[in-house]
Every structure is written in C-alpha cells, then in structure tokens.
Amino acid sequence: MRAVVQRVSQASVTISDNIVAQIEKGLLVFLGISKIDQVSDISWMADKIVNLRIFEDDQNKMNRSLLDIMGDMIVVSQFTLYGDCRKGRRPSFTDSATPEKAKVLYDNFLSYLKEKYPINVQQGEFQAHMKVNIVNDGPVTLLLDSQKLF
C-alpha cells in the first residue's frame, strides 16, 4: 500500500462538476493498493498517516499530528502510484491490485479511519474521473509504503 500525503490548507474533489469532498486544514491522501497488499497493511498505513507530526507547533516546528490539530482528511484512490516507468515510455500497472481487490481494501481503509479516529474523513469516488484541487501548505508532501520500500 502506498500513499502520497500532502499537508493542505484546503482541498476538494470534483466529479462531473459536483464537489464530492471538501476540507480546510488537514491532509489529502492519494492511496494506491498493490496486488500483494493485505488487510494488515490498513492499520499500519492509517495509523502512520494520522499520527505523522507534520503540522507546526507554536515554535514553527513540525511537531503536531492531524489528531493534535483535529484536522480533516480526504482520501483518493490512485492506482497509478504503482505505475512502473523503468522501461519504455508507457507506465506498467502490473503491480496494482485488481479493481475488485483494491475497492475492498480502499473501503476498509476508510472504515478503519472513520471508526478509530475522531476526525472528518472524506473521500473521492473509487474508479471515477476526478478533479482534485489542492492548496499544498508548505509545501509538505510525503511518500509512504507499507512494504517500507521507501
């Protein structure tokens, strides 16, 4: 499971001219599911993201988590995080999970966050063409991988 985590001052997701998710201060998370991911990856990834100390404290040090600031989160499924561009010019997505498997893990990831944490979690629509509007705050962008490849 991979995530691109962006600290945002605001973000929104639009599908067919309808805003389906919108937040102020918080995190926008692009989440990719691989063919080897399992349910056990969900808790590691969700707990890591929510507890990352990437928000500034009173001394302007990144020392506060999403929970500390009671920020919001948007999660957007993005299979392209497993695009392999090492050969040729067209990415290969053979490491991405099948849509059926990815949907189950994506939904379970969202449920885990919503059940465990007292934060506003919103989401994009799985397999939809979305327009994601982001005001990256910092900018702060982090890459996470449940297999700890980076």
From Swiss-Prot:
Signal peptide: none annotated. A motif (Gly-cisPro motif, important for rejection of L-amino acids) lies at residues 138-139. Its EC number is 3.1.1.96. It catalyses: glycyl-tRNA(Ala) + H2O = tRNA(Ala) + glycine + H(+); a D-aminoacyl-tRNA + H2O = a tRNA + a D-alpha-amino acid + H(+). GO terms for cellular component: cytoplasm. Transmembrane segments: none annotated. Pfam families: Tyr_Deacylase. It is an enzyme of class 3 (hydrolase). Keywords: Cytoplasm, Hydrolase, RNA-binding, tRNA-binding. A Gly-cisPro motif from one monomer fits into the active site of the other monomer to allow specific chiral rejection of L-amino acids. An aminoacyl-tRNA editing enzyme that deacylates mischarged D-aminoacyl-tRNAs. Also deacylates mischarged glycyl-tRNA(Ala), protecting cells against glycine mischarging by AlaRS. Acts via tRNA-based rather than protein-based catalysis; rejects L-amino acids rather than detecting D-amino acids in the active site. By recycling D-aminoacyl-tRNA to D-amino acids and free tRNA molecules, this enzyme counteracts the toxicity associated with the formation of D-aminoacyl-tRNA entities in vivo and helps enforce protein L-homochirality. Belongs to the DTD family. This is D-aminoacyl-tRNA deacylase. It comes from Petrotoga mobilis (strain DSM 10674 / SJ95).
